[in-house]
Amino acid sequence: MTDEEYMQRALELAMRGAGWVNPNPLVGAVVVRDGRIIGEGWHPAFGELHAERQALADCRQRGEATEGATIYVTLEPCCHTGKTPPCTEALIEAGIARVVMGAPDPNPKVDGGGVAQLQAAGIEVVQGVLVEECQEINRAFFHYIETGKPYVILKYAMTLDGKIATRSGKSKWITGEEARKRVHADRQRYAAIMVGVNTVIKDDPLLTCRLDSFESSDVEELQVVDESDFEDLLEREMAEDEAAFEADLEGCADSTLRGFGTFKPRCSNPIRIICDTRLRTPLDSQVVRTAAEIPTYIATCERDLEKHLPYRERECDIIVVPEAAGHVDIEILMEKLGELGIDSVIVEGGAEINWSVLAYEVVSCVQAYVAPKIFGGAAAPSPVGGLGVEAPKYAIELSDPKVTQLGRDLLIECEVK
């Protein structure tokens, strides 16, 4: 196998941490000696061992010696002590002879320091193998490290004639099951989901990841859980999680370490953020009623603590932000979310909040799910409302699209320039 093939395997392993490592990066590692994989690992969750240490531990579990081996890792090994000890020390102590690296780590605590430490210890370091792929899986992490603000994805589903609902406001379902699986995989992967209060009032959504136990790296295996079953699922989770996880570990293959089994016991719900300028979120809404189980923030311009109290009693957190043009100041909100450690946000609101996040220039990526259907109707809403631009030359410019077919639907993804 080539360096690229081993790195591709490390990328697959890295994705198993999706939804669990935030605000840390996704990282995978593969240890190879004499053309044979002797250990594998990935960063399974925030605060747990990093991929390199997991892979070295896997080698020990298998009874394999690491002296003179090569390790393939998707991100530059860390060289500082945070929640866990530095990985560079572990690699040096393990006698690793060669480190093949994907992307450099822009974290100021690393930023080339990992490479320097390894080279100073006489370890050969090869950089830039599948670097674009390694950067792609951590685009949210890189953005957060460089700006201190969340990586924002604007997501919507529409018909081929650009409608997100019929003239009567009905929208279930525009896209098919494969597209909806992908949406929930992203809810698993990214830290938070944000909507406007009008969406809460109109649709009363749960804003959860409705995927049952699944392997994070394999979207094709995801199973959708009906929203109507979610409250029952929450109750079962409390009783079943520990037992289910232990059962998973008992059933792991010998080569899989206890503590980071192949399958996650339950899906990971995103943090929920409601933009609510005047604090109108209904107290009996599903997001408020389930705030004790799922972290829920309400961003508002309302400063009256008496009005905050009913929400706080139901375990919602209130974020007070300034008002701008009659709405929550989105730019200030993003700064506050960054301070809370939220590295990524999916915006799944209606036309007005979609325009707001675009107008404030906080969006990094646009995801448009397009179904081969036509709704028609002048009263049927489009994905982006607001004032809009005056002339084509003022359009918000996007990158060349990446197009993925999901069943009969298309996912069109563009970065905002």
What are the roles of these predicted feature ranges?
Residues 2-25, 83, 151-152, 158-417:
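Enzymes that bind and transform nitrogen-containing heteroaromatic metabolites
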Residues 8, 12-15, 39, 50-53, ...:
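A broad detector of short, well-ordered amphipathic alpha-helices
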Residues 28:
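Helix-turn-helix
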Residues 31, 36-133, 256, 297, ...:
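Zn2+-dependent cytidine deaminase-like catalytic core
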Residues 64-67, 94, 147, 188, ...:
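Structured loop/turn residues at beta-strand edges in well-structured enzyme cores
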Residues 108-109, 135, 354, 376:
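Generic structural signal for helix capping and beta-alpha/helix-loop junctions
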Residues 115, 131-138, 180-187:
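Hydrophobic, well-ordered secondary-structure segments
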Residues 138-151:
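Flexible, polar/acidic helix-loop-strand segments at domain edges
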